[in-house]
Each structure stands twice: as C-alpha cells, then as structure tokens.
Amino acid sequence: VLSIMGCSSVFLVESNKKKCRFLSEVVRATNCSAVVHNGRIETYNDARDFDYIIARALAPLDRLLKLSFSLDRGQARCLFLKGRNYEQELIQAKKKWNMDVQIHKSLSFTLSSSAEKEFRGVVLEITNLRLKGG
C-alpha cells in the first residue's frame, strides 16, 4: 500500500514463500517500486538505511525492538500494530529499552453485539530506541 501511494522505496521482508509470491504479483500488477525479500528478518543482514520499520502480528514488543535495533541501531521510526495486551508488552519492553513512544488508536474495529465499536488495538510509534545501559 505504501508503495502504491507513492513512497519511493519500500522493502518488504516475508518468510512465507506463498505470501512473497502474492506480494511480488501485487508489485508487478500495480507497477510500484517495492522490493520483496523472501527470508526471515532475524537473518536479514543487507546494509540499508530504513526510515520506517513496520510490523503486524510478528512478535512481542520486546522482540520487535531487538529485531528493529539490529537492523538500524535505533535510527528508524517504528510502527507496530499491537492488540489488547500492548500495555503489558510496553511495561515489559521498558525494562530493557529506552524509547520515545506515541500510542495511536488503531482504526481497526469490530461491531460488538450491542452494535457499538469495540477497541481492537493500537499503533505504537517508537523513536529514539536505545538499549538501557548501552
């Protein structure tokens, strides 16, 4: 979506080959400039500068921070979609990490039985990521 909207450099890492084929087909069909890398983020080691690191349903926050930090040493702006337990994950992560965090309500909602919108999650916007004591 970011590449379709005009972002000039989008790099996607996906370990599932079937999803990679789908993403590659979308890139081809929409003539956008995204690059799809089939592999695990834990083993990705190509030197790049990232402006943003975005993840959804990948890992607990503490692990996401570790992965992000290994990619760019805390320089990128991280956008992580998290569910109901985000507060506990944030408390746990702050034991190891210093960071600036903004919490944005997710626009993803479901209708409850009372037909009212039910909260489903947040987007954690994290900058200035640093390992405590490091």
Where would I find each of the regions flagged by the language model?
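S-adenosylmethionine
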Residues: 6-7, 11-133
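Aromatic pocket-lining residues of Rossmann-like dinucleotide-binding sites
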Residues: 2
